[in-house]
From Swiss-Prot:
Gene label: aroK
Binding site for Mg(2+): S18
Protein name, per record: Shikimate kinase
Residues reported to bind substrate: D36, R60, G82, R139
Organism expressing this protein natively: Thioalkalivibrio sulfidiphilus (strain HL-EbGR7)
EC number(s) on file: 2.7.1.71
Pfam families with a match to the protein in the record: SKI (PF01202)
Signal sequence region: none
Biological process annotations from GO: amino acid biosynthetic process; aromatic amino acid family biosynthetic process; chorismate biosynthetic process
InterPro entries: P-loop_NTPase (IPR027417), Shikimate/glucono_kinase (IPR031322), Shikimate_kinase/TSH1 (IPR000623), Shikimate_kinase_CS (IPR023000)
Length: 190
């Protein structure tokens, strides 16, 4: 981990990066950023619209630029898109940006968590399971390559995942955050 106090959440769609990221940020009293949401704010359109008009390459260009911008901030929890690790320059950037945490989940869990979400352009296919398996085969080694910490989100509650990351972060970043533990319990146990 670098001297910055950022926490970067990586992993496949449906791993819980946004949900866990918000609760982790609240527990650590840090601002939360979601790179996909920041892209949507900046462009004024949703991710599927960007894919429709610019293709995946256009979206990945926007994503790389947004990650560069967000990594200039210090003391944030950042949820990245599932494909952010596809470009070598993004992997290098994220590794240098802070503590990289791989939120690992199974394809079965991904399917359950994303079944009704039409905001996932890569899953708009006849066989979402096959697509998720293909993405996992390609991306899992890339997530592992840059992760300092890997947490399985299949077996633990949101609360336990947040506690595990918080504990690791505090042990390795003692001077960067307040040590007041009075309000570090996340809400819900999802």
């Amino acid at each position: 981990m670098t001297q910055t106090s950022n926490i970067i959440l990586i992993g496949p769609m449906g791993a819980g990066k946004s949900t866990i990221g918000r609760q982790l940020a609240a527990a650590l009293h840090l601002p939360f950023r979601d790179s996909d949401k920041e892209i949507e704010k900046r462009t004024g359109v949703d991710i599927p619209t960007i894919f429709e008009f610019e293709g995946e390459e256009g979206f990945r260009n926007r994503e790389s630029a947004m990650l560069e911008e967000l990594c200039t901030e210090q003391g944030i929890v950042l949820a990245t898109g599932g494909g952010a690790v596809m470009r070598p320059q993004n992997r290098a950037l994220l590794r240098d940006c802070g503590l990289v945490v791989y939120l690992k989940t199974s394809v079965k869990t991904q399917l359950r968590r994303t079944a009704r979400d039409r905001n996932r352009p890569l899953l708009q296919t006849e066989n979402p399971r096959a697509r998720l398996e293909e993405l996992m085969r390609i991306r899992d080694p890339l997530y592992r390559e840059i992760a300092e910490l890997t947490v399985d989100t299949d077996r633990d509650s949101i609360r336990k995942v947040v506690q595990e990351i918080s504990r690791y972060y505090r042990m390795n970043n003692k001077d960067s955050i307040p040590q007041d533990d009075s309000n570090t319990e996340p809400q819900g146990d999802g």
